[in-house]
């Protein structure tokens, strides 16, 4: 890891942040002990009250940042309602952070099917058995549901539930933060007016 902070050589000539994120994620994959793709996901409910929780990033390209969930969960309902979200990655071992926010779209059925099929069989059963974010009267009820769906799909493929898919955050802001001495940190923000717009870049006071 460089100790010199963020320099002009860290960025593409096209002012495009996704390549820099890919490099930082690669560094985190080599450095972080657990789940380098873990990210805090922030949403808001219909009253503007925020919620935040950890999810796992499952894809990133120049279209945006992808994760998967139950659309009937709290986060699923809030995203479907507001169509906006924010993320924050923190890699303590690297003394780095990336924040982003933007509009949210649903991934294609083909993308969701492909990722769902790659999951362990038990996780695919869990997508059917868990009524995510709703009250659970006891652990036995969940285990019973798992057993029932395991029996139902004992042979053959397990189809993807219609309420389970992926979201893609299409960012309008991505900020890269690097820790430096005396809290004189480096902060570089990439901004654009719309998810399809051109990026501009600005250095921020720490």
Swiss-Prot record:
Task: Provide the alphabetized UniProt keywords.
Answer: Flavoprotein, FMN, Oxidoreductase, Pyridoxine biosynthesis
Residues binding substrate: 58, 115, 119, 123, 183-185
Pathway-wise, it operates in: Cofactor metabolism; pyridoxal 5'-phosphate salvage; pyridoxal 5'-phosphate from pyridoxamine 5'-phosphate: step 1/1; Cofactor metabolism; pyridoxal 5'-phosphate salvage; pyridoxal 5'-phosphate from pyridoxine 5'-phosphate: step 1/1
> What is the free-text note on the cofactor?
Binds 1 FMN per subunit.
**GO molecular function terms attached to this record:** FMN binding; pyridoxamine phosphate oxidase activity
Q: What is its EC number?
A: 1.4.3.5
Q: Quote the catalytic activity from the record.
A: pyridoxamine 5'-phosphate + O2 + H2O = pyridoxal 5'-phosphate + H2O2 + NH4(+); pyridoxine 5'-phosphate + O2 = pyridoxal 5'-phosphate + H2O2
Pfam family membership, one: PNP_phzG_C
Q: Which GO terms describe its biological process?
A: pyridoxine biosynthetic process
Which cofactors, by name?
Answer: FMN
Q: Where does FMN bind?
A: 53-58, 68-69, 75, 97, 132-133, 177, 187
Q: Does the keyword Flavoprotein apply?
A: yes
In terms of NCBIfam families, this protein maps to: pdxH, PRK05679.1
Q: Outline the subunit composition.
A: Homodimer.
Listed PANTHER family? PYRIDOXINE-5'-PHOSPHATE OXIDASE, PYRIDOXINE-5-PHOSPHATE OXIDASE
Name the family the entry cites.
Belongs to the pyridoxamine 5'-phosphate oxidase family.
Protein name per its UniProtKB record: Pyridoxine/pyridoxamine 5'-phosphate oxidase
Q: Report the gene name.
A: pdxH
């Amino acid at each position: 890891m460089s100790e010199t902070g963020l320099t002009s050589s860290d960025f593409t000539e096209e002012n495009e942040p996704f390549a820099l994120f890919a490099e930082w994620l690669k560094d985190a994959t080599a450095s972080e002990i657990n789940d380098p793709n873990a990210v805090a996901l922030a949403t808001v409910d219909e009253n503007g009250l925020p919620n935040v929780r950890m999810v796992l990033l499952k894809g990133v390209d120049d279209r945006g940042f992808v994760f998967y969930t139950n659309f009937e969960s709290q986060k699923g309902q809030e995203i479907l309602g507001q169509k906006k979200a924010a993320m924050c990655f923190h890699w303590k071992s690297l003394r780095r952070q990336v924040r982003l926010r933007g509009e949210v779209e649903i991934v294609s059925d083909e993308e969701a099917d492909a990722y769902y099929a790659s999951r362990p069989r038990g996780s695919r059963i869990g997508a059917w058995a868990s009524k995510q974010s709703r009250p659970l009267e006891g652990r036995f009820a969940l285990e019973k549901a798992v057993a029932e769906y395991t029996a139902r799909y004992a042979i053959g493929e397990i189809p993807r539930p219609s309420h389970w898919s992926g979201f893609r955050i299409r960012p309008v802001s991505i900020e890269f933060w690097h820790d430096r001495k005396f809290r004189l940190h480096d902060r570089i923000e990439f901004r654009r007016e719309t998810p399809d717009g051109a990026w501009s870049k600005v250095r921020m006071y720490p």
